[in-house]
Amino acid sequence: MRKFCTVAFLLATAYTAVAQQGIGVFDAATNVGNPAIQGKVQYNAQTQEYTMQGAGSNMWFNNDQFQFLYKKIKGDFIISATVRFLGEGVNPHRKIGIIARDQLTANSRYADACVHGDDLTSLQYRPIDDANTEQVTLSVFHPNHIELERRGDTFYFSAAVHGEHYKTVSKVLPLNEEVYAGLFICSHEEKVVEKAVFSNVRVIIPAPRNFTPYREYIGSHIEVMDVQTGLRTIVHSAANSLQAPNWTKDNQLLYNSEGLLYKFNLANGAIQKVNTGFANQNNNDHVLSFDGKQIGISHHAGEKRTSTLYTLPIAGSDQPKQVTRDTGHSWLHGFSPDGKKLVFTGWRKNQYDIWTIDIATGKETQLTNTPTLDDSPEYSPDGKWIYFNSVRTGTMKLWRMRADGSNEEQVTFDEYNDWFPHFSPDGKWIVYLSYPKDIDPTDHPWYKKVYIRLMPAAGGVPKTIAYVYGGQGTINVPSWSPDSKRIAFVSNSKL
């Protein structure tokens, strides 16, 4: 039986009091070290934010006092959050962050991702019970986004100012297999209470290190993010693989799961299977026409399981219309703005290039011709350009060309491997996915730490807007809201 959780059913109670067990995704809150003033936590289920209040003399030397919102976790994990203090504060050494401890005692071994009120950002740790705290400093000042990861006996602290990429430090520290892990706040003053807000909180149980891609899967969260504010909310979760949401004109999310397409209603959380007839082996390359009336799908057809393109009405159909023939894999990425063509990555002439096909006549037109991989093509809303990603320089970067294939030019230039450029409906922005440089540039694997990035369509410096555990299936297809204010995507965790 699959486990499902939809945020629509949680909105009846907007706030959770500290006395309650089960606060958001955490088990409980407690005051470690018996601070003179007891802390508390409020959880806003609508925004999925935690407001923490806490006192405490310090988290240093051999004794800690702080407010702790935790859950017990075994093995590897990643906890991430967007953090901010409320108010100017009293002591510049007030601190907030993410922590993992053996015990709830004041002298327990621990490792944390700690942000101070001043410029200090550090991975703090106590190597044995009763020992003095030590630290590894991180050269990020006043970060907004933080992450604590456990991988075996090594803890990694990553942090970034909004818009930038993570910087990371690490420490080998063999804590218990099961730890208390979560969020903390300490005022550094016994008689002072400080406040902080933790948003975009994710508790991630990653895929096993030896998992088999495309055979073994972990759970999925469908998320919606306000591009301007950066606030992310999980709208639907499942223990199986959900992939690649599109955003329909009537505010539903169209996504793939196990070869089928489903619509998720953002207003009420209802899920409806889309009728695709015989096409029941669809991959995650599905798109909507610009007018929102048609769906394009990529179905693995025949004995060869060739990825083949079809179109059907947005309401579904028993008989999707076949567009490409059995001439090699075709991976769909978009309609032309006039709805007359599809643009796709095609295996033709023993290589993958960018092609278009006339839906009415079936005539294919080759637009790129390189021995290296060109992929993920998408029309600009005005129809003048096609953006895509190419590994022709040795790194997967964004490129663009005229709609007829002329004037190819590179668009992004940094060290990351960039995939899946998607235009906002108003034509002003491009959002895309970036893998770190140690990932094979020809691959977009599952279950990696990736960035969702944003750049002006007119050109400019990209900025990171989301720090995500995902990759394949996260944002393969266009997922902007019709008003160009939000995007949908998939993140992953074992659920």
Give the positions of each predicted feature:
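Extracellular glycan-recognition regions
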Residues: Q20-F211
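Assembly/interface hotspot detector across virion components, adhesins/toxins, and nucleic-acid enzymes
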Residues: K3, V41, L148, L254, ...
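Composition- and surface-driven signal marking solvent-exposed, interaction-prone regions
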Residues: F4, S158-G163, S424, N492
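Sequence signature of WD/YWTD-type beta-propeller architectures
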Residues: A207-L495
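Bacterial Sec-dependent N-terminal signal peptides
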Residues: M1-Q21
